[in-house]
Design a protein with these regions (language model features):
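Peripheral, non-catalytic segments flanking oxidoreductase cores
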Residues: 1-194
């Protein structure tokens, strides 16, 4: 278990800014419009998940957030493409899906380079993880934490949790809130720098 900050990654400022613009535009749509993008039967693997719907493992109260999932854009494996749900197209925002796909692919490529560095550190072949992650079941989750107008009872923005993925890449947050539990059992702020 670990947490690091990375500089010189593949996600450029222009793409990051475009993603924030598109995602903000989506979350500013009415609840009625956003509800058209809730995909039943997929356990929130693609599309929109509304405010308060998801809760952390062991919690009964929904987190105070809403989010959108972009998933894998399968390349060169038609059988696998049939197994993954399609990404959801947002009709109201003409650039939303293209920007989401570009960001997804840049983050996935960044993750590949990080795993190659880990493989080298572990004295494995540099490309050891490549075959395990190619067309993997990755998710790009864009999260919106709406303003809280009154203090909620027992609810949290996002309850303490551990990620279940091989690695998790987080873009620098626009606000404070993310904390990481260190080996001494203390919660410390994870503050992202500009790059």
């Amino acid at each position: 278990i670990g947490f690091i900050a990375i500089k010189g990654h593949l996600l450029d400022d222009k793409t990051k800014d475009e993603l924030y613009t598109e995602v903000k535009s989506f979350f500013n749509l009415s609840d009625e419009v956003k509800s058209n993008y809730i995909i039943k039967g997929l356990a929130s693997q693609r599309g929109f998940t509304p405010f308060g719907k998801e809760s952390a493992k062991g919690k009964n109260i929904g987190d105070l957030k809403e989010f959108w999932h972009f998933g894998q854009y399968v390349k060169d494996e038609p059988k696998l493409k049939e197994e993954y749900p399609d990404n959801v197209i947002v009709n109201e925002l003409k650039n939303f899906n293209a920007v989401g796909q570009k960001t997804y692919e840049l983050l996935e490529e960044t993750g590949k380079h990080i795993l190659r560095a880990i493989a080298c550190y572990l004295n494995l072949e540099e490309t050891y993880f490549d075959k395990h992650i190619f067309n993997g079941n990755s998710i790009l989750r864009a999260i919106h934490y709406p303003p809280i107008t009154e203090e909620p009872k027992n609810a949290e923005r996002a309850a303490a949790h551990g990620d279940i993925n091989l690695i998790t890449l987080l873009m620098g947050a626009q606000g404070k809130g993310l904390q990481v539990l260190n080996n001494s059992g203390e919660w410390i702020d994870a503050v992202a720098e500009e790059d």
